[in-house]
Amino acid sequence: MLHLKVQFLDDSQKIFVVDQKSSGKALFNLSCGHLNLAEKEYFGLEFCSHSGNNVWLELLKPITKQVKNPKEVVFKFMVKFFPVDPGHLREELTRYLFTLQIKKDLALGRLPCSDNCTALMVSHILQSELGDFHEETVRKHLVQTQYLPSQASLESKIMQFHQQHIGRSPAESDILLLDIARKLDMYGIRPQPASDGEGMQIHLAVAHMGVLVLRGNTKINTFNWAKIRKLSFKRKHFLIKLHANILVLCKDTLEFTMASRDACKAFWKTCVEYHAFFRLSEEPKSKPKTLLCSKGSSFRYSGRTQRQLLEYGKKGRLKSLPFERKQYPSQYHERQCRSSPDILSDVSKQVEDLRLTYGSSYYRNVNGVHASESMLDSRRRNSAVEVTFAAELEHSKPEAEATSLHPSQSSSSFTFIYADPVFNTDPEPIEFFEERSPLSSFQTTSKFADSHTSKASPARQLTYTDVPYIPCTSQKVDIMPPQVFFYVDKPPQVPRRSLIMAEENMRPDSYVDHSAIKPAKRSPRNMRIKSLQQDLQELQEAMARTSGRSNINVEPEEEDPHLDDAFAYNLQEQTPKRSQSQSDMKTIRFPFGSEFRPLGPCPALTRKTDLFACTFAEQEFPTVLIDQSSAERYVASESSDSESEIIKPDYYFLYGKGTKSPRARIRLSSGSLQLEEEDETISFATPGAEDRTLLKPCNYFLA
């Protein structure tokens, strides 16, 4: 087996393994397959022969017969045939490779032209490689990369032209560069030193039109293919036989002397391939060998001709395959990429934190999925996306706000926003809002009520909240107060209801001496106690109607050893309220148990703090009564999520398993937050999450 090294036009190298007896076509096909190149006939593999001449690898000849030490030779993948019009190139990858070849020719000084033309071509290369103009980036890149032999004197012109290319894609820059290069005299020219019959030093070259004679960089004669009758070589003499012209008395055979026989033979082979590729309609067939010794070389061109390539491309048989352009580190300056490393590093660092945090046994929201802890976001840095997002939200606040937004302390951190928890005391569910409201929580609707009359209620702005589950303490209470997160604008005001009286009212054998309360003094405390008693009666009636029992006694859970940890959370930074004018907030209401979840493990863009420690810090018994007037209950059944039976709008279930419902996810798409729903649920909860009774007080969604 042979291990052969190939160097491509972007200076990358790859080693291919071929058989010992493989021909050059095997290595060439492997190289083109590595690039996913369809129009491969324009290219070839060049190497330095043992005589020191650069020659093309023959496709029909074994590699070992062309190269003495194949393992020590580097084959260069280069453009072999330059079409007269680069517009004939169908594929973007082909044009990109031609651009890389033009770039190499400019660096080697093979494309002499005026300073303006040279600077313009380099500016197109910079636009393709670096993108839009940025002075500091372009200046540093020109210092590190040599595009021209004398580049320092043209840097100002290059940068001046580069400023005019803002908004052009790399593919457009490639087309413009090739259009300029094709008009140059030395486009696609590989001159070979020679001398004429009089001993004058000249250069010979071959192009799509025929054989050229040059003196320096100036063409002094052109022999078109139509005029040439035969091309041959004898030792180091190259012979051109022309068609006889009766009108003009001239020689029909021209002889040129080249440096060596190998150089002369290599140039002759190149002329044969150029003539076949540009002039023939199909690949020439091999000549049958005679029994007797035949005179002359049997070399021929192998591959599709240009006409076949064009016809093949017109029929749409060439498949465009994706490719990757060479990237330069200098094209990403600080302003463009400072957020990307931050986000990626946060994702990798927080995967374990997410698993540990969501694996806790006592911190769970109403859907059985663990809510995020404050420690998760405390170690996370704010990326540039969040900085921009916070700044935009600060300037896009709605005109009518229920509360005032406190200014943030820094541009890179979010401010947290609070609102008062409002307990709905209406005994009937409220009407469904006809108009769309921004970022509203799950709202009730009379359309799904079971023959219940509904009263018109003034529309109030609803905000999204998350209600994690917290186990009860040793106090004999029915319902524990959830840990509430509010995305509104001011610190919460603790409701001044007597929690001790609430506890007494929840007990069936409790007795409250109302005679001790003076009826003449109507204090707010007495009014709240009376309202509390009414709420308790309504709660018992509603629970009796739904469960079919007159008395409901919920046994208290065992004392949780982690209860102290639940009260030990500290307030984090404040998060901004989303503006009503944002285009991505298009949902009227959130589905039951909806929450923001990203498409994969990624840093959260919002932070939440717990209101539990702030609200009940001074209370001895952390209990509160929850109004059940406007709630919706989903009955757990064996059917799918979409077939869950709705008993009453906005009613929560007390027994059994809660049904799963679609959750809202965040998809980062162009700096905006798009909410979409999906049916599948991704839970980081412990295995016992589904077996626990979940409480969902709906009135905590109202603010």
Swiss-Prot record:
It is found in: Cell projection, Neuron projection; Cell projection, Growth cone. Residues 525-552 form a coiled coil. GO terms for cellular component: cytoskeleton; cytosol; growth cone; neuron projection; neuronal cell body; nucleoplasm; plasma membrane. Keywords: Cell projection, Coiled coil, Neurogenesis. Induction: Up-regulated during retinoic acid-induced differentiation of neuroblastoma cells. Pfam families: FA, FERM_C, FERM_M, FERM_N. Residues 2-282 form the FERM domain. In the developing cerebral cortex, strong expression is observed in the ventricular and intermediate zones at 13 and 17 dpc. At 17 dpc and P0, expression appears to be restricted to the cortical plate. In neonates, highly expressed in cortex, hippocampus, cerebellum, olfactory bulb and eye with little or no expression in liver, kidney, skeletal muscle or heart muscle (at protein level). SMART domains: B41 (SM00295), FA (SM01195), FERM_C (SM01196). GO terms for biological process: negative regulation of stress fiber assembly; nervous system development; positive regulation of lamellipodium assembly; positive regulation of small GTPase mediated signal transduction; regulation of neuron projection development. Plays a role in neurite development, may be through the activation of the GTPase RAC1. Plays a role in the control of eye movement and gaze stability. This is FERM domain-containing protein 7. It comes from Mus musculus. The lineage of its organism: Eukaryota, Metazoa, Chordata, Craniata, Vertebrata.
